[in-house]
Amino acid sequence: MRVRFLKFICIFCFSFALVGLEAQEKKSPETLKIQEKEISVSTKSAEQPTEEKKEDTYIKEEELKPTSNQKKDPVVFGFLVDGYYNASLNRPDSKELQYTTQATRTNEYNINLAYVDAKVETDKYRGRLALQFGTSVVANYGGEGTTGKTSNETSIRNMQEAYGGFRLGKSTWLDAGIYFGHLGYESWISHENFVYTRAFSLDYVPYYVSGVRLSGKITEKLSYQLHLNNGYQVVTDNNKDISGGFRLEWNPTGNLMFRWNTFAGNEQPTATPKEMRYYNNFIAEWKPFEHLTLASSFDVGYQERASREDLVYTDNGPLYVRRDSNAFRQIYVGNIWFAYRFLPEWRIGTRLERYLDREQMIIVTNSKDGFQTGGATATLDYIPDPAVLVRFTYQYRRSMDSIYPHEAHTSKLDRMFIFSLSIKI
């Protein structure tokens, strides 16, 4: 009996355990669902502040982003400071160089050019205002004339450019005011050139003009400029005549450029007989590789003689010589440039030049053979940043006559070392 009773108790307990296990298995899915709901609710409650913060941050970022209705400021401001030390081997007593506008003060540190500017360019209008200072400014504007009380000659020397323009067509613009001249290969701003100083041909063509300019494209590879100006590098006109010229630029390929610039106008004051000047400037530039540039220019100029009597200079002094006809005076100029950036931060630039103005049409030396000069210039550039340019320049020039200041006298040679540092933003 006891054995049967014990068996009954064991079977009952085992059956009860199985029933309890089945009941637990049936209830576990519901329990898990409830637990999942509780976990999800708690997770949402915990994550809700983070999502709100993300949404607030997103809204703030969207507010900071410019919308299509907001216009960007079209005005861009910039400046340049170009300082130099000219160690002239001629060591002129006056410390002043002649026949150049660049680095004119010798054996002292000075500012060649400094300017601040504001530029604007949109689809419909454009313009630039730049105020400038420096020794090159004083030298370059020395010939600016005075024709009246309000002729503005005292203030324009500090005005590098002041012009405005608007679009006439798809690629046609009309500008008016004071702006850079169109003759020559090198820029007025040395920071943009391969060589620190300027070629003679660039120092004696207009860096600036005052007038009206029409520019545009004839084809995708051919562009033009038409100019009406007060004169040859003058803002204040010295006569009643209008001067002008044009530019044609052809880019047959992406690395080849040809340019033809012209000028025509009377350069004599109203009180003197008219002498028309005609100037042609031809330029070719080739960039066979990304860091290599080869360029050349050839200039030819003619100017009428006012009379058959021509002033010439002899060993015995100046005298007038009667000509058979009032033929034109002539000048011929040639330049070659080579620039190679052999390392990311280093570049070498060289220039060869020849200037022939025997009859002193543009450059007056008061010497027998006039201005017949040639030379070579080399500049080594260190470019630690696109805005910074450290330059080491050597320049050698030789003239047929003794015209260059040399201590208390003159010399046929002009040699100098120039160190310069410029920052352009």
Q: What residue ranges belong to the model's regions?
A:
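Transmembrane beta-barrel strands of outer-membrane/channel proteins
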Residues: 79-87, 129-133, 176-178, 226-230, ...
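N-terminal periplasmic/intermembrane-space "pro-region" immediately following the signal or transit peptide
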Residues: 21-92
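Bacterial N-terminal signal peptides
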Residues: 9-17
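Surface-exposed coil loops of outer-membrane beta-barrel proteins
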Residues: 88-108, 137-161, 168-250, 259-266, ...
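Outer-membrane beta-barrel pore domains
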Residues: 100-103, 140, 147-155, 256-262, ...
